[in-house]
Amino acid sequence: MNKVLVLMGGTSEEREVSLKSGKAVYEGLKDAGYEVEALDFTPETIHRIREYSPDVVFITLHGKNGEDGTVQGYLELLGIPYTGSGVLASAVCMNKVITKKLLSYEGLPTADFQVIKKRGFNRDLFNPDLLMEDFGLPLVVKPATQGSSVGTSIVRKRKNIVPALELALSLDEEILVEKFIAGTELTVTVLGKDNLKTLPVIEIVPKNEYYDYESKYMPGMSDHLIPARISEEERERVEEISCKAYDAVGCRGYGRIDLILDRGGNPYILEINTLPGMTGTSLVPDAARAAGIKFPELLDLFVKMALEK
């Protein structure tokens, strides 16, 4: 029997979400027949990973110092297999600026964007009209390295542009400003390393203005429609683009690609999640259920893929 250590918690703004994911994974792995331990991961407890002598580490950390390649690199040094993508893909996908640049280079569709850095930003000298000329209104403001929509704003009025920039810059050294694309929010779970497979496409219908933190983690705040209300041609295109994006950044094991399908049926990649949530309201478990895969079976698959790396 393989021994699995579940890493949860962490020190990022997404700590509470990580704890929920970790607890769900802990129980699911026990149901799958594994010997399971759990560790609330902090700088003070990192040394205990070796003490557990796990065969596999199941990472349910979200955000900085967990999803960004740092923990993955530490586990590589220890020689312990772990779930999800490796160091490079984790680091790339944690940074939305680098991800956007890479996707654009690969010719994959993503919304027009501009990068603003904290260094040199002066609210008194900044001219919001320049962003409005490039993107119009509404526009989207995101911190580069936050997850779960933390610090993200959809700005519909000129007077709210600078406050949205300041909010995002309070959380990060650089931020993204994107053209807002109206349409259908979709997400695709991709599995594997070489022979990629996808789980059913999910359409996300948030109760709030967009798929924000509350919509993601509060029960009843979003509907996950499976199958998505899109044509077969659109579904195939979305799956194809998702697999190309997953492969372009070097993901392995599993990941979730978030997209928007505009009103003309054109898909745009929003984000690539290398450690998507595993809570009771999370999308990946929902997609697996729609494919006939129970939660313990899904976790068992992730562990086996980690051991095959």
Swiss-Prot record:
It is found in: Cytoplasm. Mg(2+) 1 binds at residues 258, 271. Residues 100-304 form the ATP-grasp domain. One of its GO terms (molecular function) is ATP binding. GO terms for cellular component: cytoplasm. Its EC number is 6.3.2.4. Pfam families: Dala_Dala_lig_C, Dala_Dala_lig_N. InterPro entries: ATP-grasp (IPR011761), ATP_grasp_subdomain_1 (IPR013815), D-Ala_lig_Van_CS (IPR000291), D_ala_D_ala (IPR005905), Dala_Dala_lig_C (IPR011095), Dala_Dala_lig_N (IPR011127), PreATP-grasp_dom_sf (IPR016185). Disulfide bonds: none annotated. Binds 2 magnesium or manganese ions per subunit. Mg(2+) 2 binds at residues 271, 273. Belongs to the D-alanine--D-alanine ligase family. This is D-alanine--D-alanine ligase.
